[in-house]
Regions:
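C-terminal regulatory/interaction regions
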Residues: 65-68, 107-214
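Short, conserved secondary-structure transition motifs
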Residues: 54-55, 76-92
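Fold-independent oxyanion-binding glycine-rich loops
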Residues: 13-17, 50-51, 80-82, 133-135, ...
Length: 214
């Protein structure tokens, strides 16, 4: 949480979500659990497009915290983003700088450093939970995973961040039945889930609480 100040000569603040409230955190956690449990029963893969800095670490923390409860030992969790791997390593190496002892590490986490590591993931037909960038699906390794999994009805895509107009991620959120990836039309048969409550921006209550301390 941001530190609170009581004095300032001038306050400049962002207000991206100043006119709305985020979804309840517990509701978000329950929805994530439900999606993953259902995906396990259907024997598919789960794709999570995520920003490399911040959002990925929040997802990893969430999965590690609920590792036993969600029966995640049945999955292989792939972190397929060189930048996200480097950023996450900082979290793991500096637990003393974080609340509650830092970010726990998933025992079944696989770090996919190279392009060859990333390509090998797409040989898995089930049991792969893949976290990769970019967060809006406009580039990065997630695009390849989408190409290999979107057409499969047993697979799931969990959208955990804002998707700007015109992006591939936004097309998925909007329910497009076909998307264009690498000059190919890919049918969208996977289930697309939009999970709120994980925004890095404070909502109206957060902003009022923060500036109310002055």
């Amino acid at each position: 949480d941001p530190a609170r100040n009581t004095e300032a000569d001038l306050v400049l603040m962002e207000s991206t979500y100043g006119n709305r409230l985020h979804r309840d955190r517990e509701a978000t956690v329950r929805e994530m659990e439900s999606i993953i449990q259902d995906a396990d029963h259907r024997r598919g893969n789960v794709l999570i497009p995520a920003f490399a800095v911040g959002r990925t670490q929040e997802i990893l923390h969430l999965l590690a915290t609920h590792y036993a409860e969600w029966n995640l030992a049945r999955w292989k969790v792939f972190l397929d983003s060189p930048m996200a791997i480097r950023t996450s390593q900082i979290y793991w190496d500096t637990p003393e700088l974080h609340d509650a002892g830092g970010m726990p590490r998933l025992p079944n986490l696989v770090l996919s450093e190279s392009a060859e590591d990333s390509q090998a993931i797409n040989r898995l037909r089930s049991g792969a939970l893949i976290i990769a960038g970019s967060g809006m699906c406009e580039g990065g390794r997630i695009v390849h995973h989408l190409k290999h999994n979107l057409w499969r009805p047993e697979c799931d895509v969990i959208i955990v961040g804002y998707q700007a107009n015109g992006t591939l991620g936004r097309q998925l959120v909007d329910g497009n039945t076909y998307v264009r990836i690498h000059q190919e039309n890919i049918r969208v048969r996977a289930r697309i889930h939009t999970v709120g409550g994980l925004s890095a921006h404070g909502d109206q209550d957060d902003l009022v609480r923060w500036y109310g301390s002055f």
